[in-house]
From Swiss-Prot:
One of its GO terms (molecular function) is L-seryl-tRNA(Sec) selenium transferase activity. Its main location: cytoplasm. The modification N6-(pyridoxal phosphate)lysine is found at residue 291. This is L-seryl-tRNA(Sec) selenium transferase. Gene3D superfamilies: 3.90.1150.180, Type I PLP-dependent aspartate aminotransferase-like (Major domain). It catalyses: L-seryl-tRNA(Sec) + selenophosphate + H(+) = L-selenocysteinyl-tRNA(Sec) + phosphate. It comes from Pseudomonas paraeruginosa (strain DSM 24068 / PA7) (Pseudomonas aeruginosa (strain PA7)). Belongs to the SelA family. Converts seryl-tRNA(Sec) to selenocysteinyl-tRNA(Sec) required for selenoprotein biosynthesis. Pathway: Aminoacyl-tRNA biosynthesis; selenocysteinyl-tRNA(Sec) biosynthesis; selenocysteinyl-tRNA(Sec) from L-seryl-tRNA(Sec) (bacterial route): step 1/1.
Length: 468
């Protein structure tokens, strides 16, 4: 094959085939892509390894368009979370209700009174946007908000216990992942760790014996991401608060996931509420916004007015504060808690957590034939009972009755590993990636969180091509 002459960059830029790319991506991006493409093709063209059709304006514009589309594709992708873990940290945790999404849109589009008092016309405090709601819902005297619960714990410890001892049970020195360990956070906050008791048993007398002139605070951490069972003992919040207050010390309680309602009302496992912690005497309570609360990522610090005031004056507070979008979403979510009778209908996280297993199984029965057709005869598709998890460290032992599509290759067990990994990759490669979980030589798609059934069903035919 003889050599073929490459078209010039200028000619391609002015071609009708490239016009839509120019309009969509701009001249600079298109120019750079065309230059790179032509540089790659120059030697093969000189050697005669390319046909003339491969260097036509239409073909080259098409290849440039593919590259530009890949370069400009958003790194943030919507996915189907079919892992069975509702509050999946790697998949974004809580899904926001429509009220919060509308509030974010409003805050993003228009100026708002973020730190402006409309009554006085003077500078305001951004925490005031949710203070009234928090007081109404929890009875707390004051509140401040930072960007996550790790920041809330760090800020509270640094503000109330710097250069002093923080007394905590040895059984509560937790790690929640991502290098967040309570002992390390206390050290970073300038608090000297004074651990008491043992891993499985800590008594009131252990705290009493530890309190001295260097004590700054007592700390209690809800061990939400693991469970110690058997021969155990711990000191309830009310008793611990009495000990702390008897010595003039504050009690800081970190609830981790945190909730404002009794979840047993919806058939879910019991989790300590913020109101209970405050009623039992905790001076400061910290918890997450994007876990059981069902809101945006945030760390809430609430409790005693004087102590919250000290926390708000800490210079670190400005470095950790939340923006207008977070506050707008948080206010909208908190507002839903005013009507607990309709909370499961309106709060997306609670609706998904409390979704009946019989409803999930019915959905699985509807989808099984379509998935079996898409995968072909080499796969067994079965509707099975499943046990999901709340996730994000909440109730690690508890399981949520659910249903799943269990996908198992019809081949010897020793060969299934690669086949299952190929299916995982194919599902992740769909326009709306599907994330399941591997278990017992099968790929499980737990449907508890499958809200958009039509979109899921519509892309199933693509699987056959992805797997071939």
């Amino acid at each position: 094959m003889s050599s073929v002459r490459l078209p010039s960059v200028d000619r391609l830029l002015r071609s009708a085939a490239a016009a839509p790319l120019h309009q969509r991506y701009g001249r600079e991006a298109l120019l750079a892509t065309l230059r790179d493409l032509l540089d790659e093709l120059r030697e093969p063209a000189r050697q005669g390894a390319l046909a003339a059709i491969e260097l036509s304006e239409a073909v080259l514009a098409g290849r440039a368009g593919e590259r530009l589309a890949a370069q400009h594709a958003s790194r943030v992708r919507r996915v189907f979370n079919l892992t069975g873990t509702v509050l999946h940290t790697n998949l974004g945790r809580a899904l926001l209700p429509e009220e919060a999404i509308e509030a974010i849109t409003l805050a993003a589009r228009y100026p708002l009174n973020l730190e402006f008092d409309l009554a006085s016309g003077k500078r305001g405090d951004r925490d005031d946007l949710i203070t009234g709601l928090i007081r109404e819902l929890t009875g707390a005297e004051a509140v401040t908000v930072v960007n996550n619960n790790a920041a809330a714990v760090l800020l509270a410890l640094n503000s109330l216990g710097a250069r002093k001892e923080g007394i905590i049970s040895r059984g509560e020195l937790i790690e929640i992942g991502g290098a967040f360990r309570i002992p390390d956070i206390m050290t970073r906050a300038g608090v000297r760790l004074h651990e008491v008791g043992t891993t499985n048993r800590t008594h009131a007398r252990d705290y009493e014996a530890a309190i001295g002139p260097r004590s700054g605070l007592l700390m209690r951490v809800h061990t939400s991401n693991y469970s110690v069972q058997g021969f155990t003992a711990s000191v309830p919040t009310a008793q611990l608060a009495a000990i702390a207050h008897g010595h003039g010390l504050p009690l800081l309680e970190d609830l981790g996931s945190g909730t404002l309602v009794d979840l047993t009302r919806w058939g879910l496992p019991k989790e300590p509420t913020v109101q209970e912690a405050l009623a039992d005497g905790a001076d400061i309570v910290t918890f997450s916004g994007d876990k059981l609360l069902g809101g945006p990522q945030a760390g809430l610090i609430l409790g005693n007015r004087e102590l919250v005031g000290r926390i708000k004056k800490n210079p670190l507070k400005r470095a950790l504060r939340v923006d207008k979008l977070t506050l707008a979403a948080l206010e909208a979510v908190l507002g839903l808690y005013r009507d607990p009778d309709r909370l499961a209908e309106r709060l997306t996280t609670l609706r998904l957590l409390s979704r009946p297993a019989v409803e999930i199984r019915a959905q699985a029965e509807r989808l099984a034939p379509a998935l079996a057709e898409a995968l072909g005869e080499d796969w067994e598709v079965a509707v099975v009972d499943a046990l999901g998890m709340i996730g994000s460290g909440a109730q690690p032992v508890a399981r949520l009755a659910s249903a799943a599509l269990c996908l198992r290759p019809r081949q010897p067990r020793r060969l299934r590993g690669r086949t299952l990994r190929n299916l995982e990759e194919a599902l992740r490669g769909l326009p709306l990636p599907v994330i399941g979980r591997l278990d017992d030589d099968a790929l499980w798609l737990d449907l508890r969180q499958l809200d958009d059934e039509p979109a899921f069903r519509a892309q199933l035919p693509r699987l056959r091509g992805e797997l071939s």
